[in-house]
């Protein structure tokens, strides 16, 4: 998959970083224009654009600085890391808002941020929670969706405080454990193995994984059956059909 090349090589370079204008800078206006021009065709196929979508603030900050450097900086250069996260968060609030203002069917915010899964609880509460919360609170939407398929137990404990009501998490966490931590107000999206089962397994493997996932779960409300992570390349139609059948 393509990856972003970092542009910050020292922590003191963060001070010169300028927040992009999402209306004019980079590929952003082209992406939004493409979505807008495709709305009619998307709706003709029975679909609708429901979410303003973005990578989360820690994910983007790590693209700019490097993942190792970002995580080390949480401990060695916290002032600069907060400065970087404020810039990225302000940008994301504007970008989410522009998407919602441009496409009237949007009624949700969808953030994808796996870097939050690499933080301990104290660091999560200091470096992740306030910035994610600010983004989710920036618009009044019915759905506030978070994807983190790295370590997710700490994230799950704080979903209510973040304002998140839809959570996609790693297949390595039993859905019962995430439910216990997240509470009953959050709808859970997951969580069969994406690559090992949905892409590389057989339809029988998919059905078996779904059955195992729901073992010991008496209340299946607020659960959307899916994979515990992103949809993998190579998932066959037969396996997807098996997942849909199992959901019924």
Stretch-by-stretch model annotation:
Residues 18-248:
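Active-site loop segments of alpha/beta catalytic cores
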């Amino acid at each position: 998959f393509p990856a972003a090349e970092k542009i910050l090589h020292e922590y003191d370079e963060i001070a010169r970083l300028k927040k992009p204008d999402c209306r004019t800078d980079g590929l952003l206006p082209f992406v939004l224009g493409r979505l807008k021009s495709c709305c009619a065709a998307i709706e003709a196929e029975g679909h609708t654009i429901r979410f303003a979508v973005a990578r989360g603030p820690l994910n983007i900050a790590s693209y700019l600085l490097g993942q190792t450097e970002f995580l080390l900086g949480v401990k060695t250069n916290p002032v600069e890391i907060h400065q970087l996260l404020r810039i990225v968060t302000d940008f994301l609030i504007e970008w989410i808002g522009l998407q919602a203002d441009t496409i009237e069917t949007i009624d949700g915010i969808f953030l994808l941020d796996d870097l939050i899964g690499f933080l301990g609880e104290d660091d999560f509460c200091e470096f992740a929670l306030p910035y994610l919360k600010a983004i989710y609170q920036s618009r009044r939407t019915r759905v506030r969706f978070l994807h983190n398929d790295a370590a997710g137990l700490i994230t799950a404990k704080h979903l209510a405080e973040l304002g998140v009501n839809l959570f996609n998490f790693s297949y390595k966490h039993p859905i019962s454990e995430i439910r216990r931590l997240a509470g009953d107000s959050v709808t859970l999206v997951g969580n069969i193995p994406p690559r090992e089962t949905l892409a590389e397994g057989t339809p029988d493997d998919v059905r078996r994984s779904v059955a195992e996932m729901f073992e010991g779960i008496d209340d299946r409300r607020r659960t959307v059956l899916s994979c515990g992570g992103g949809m993998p390349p190579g998932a066959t139609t037969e396996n997807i059909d098996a997942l849909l059948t199992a959901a019924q």
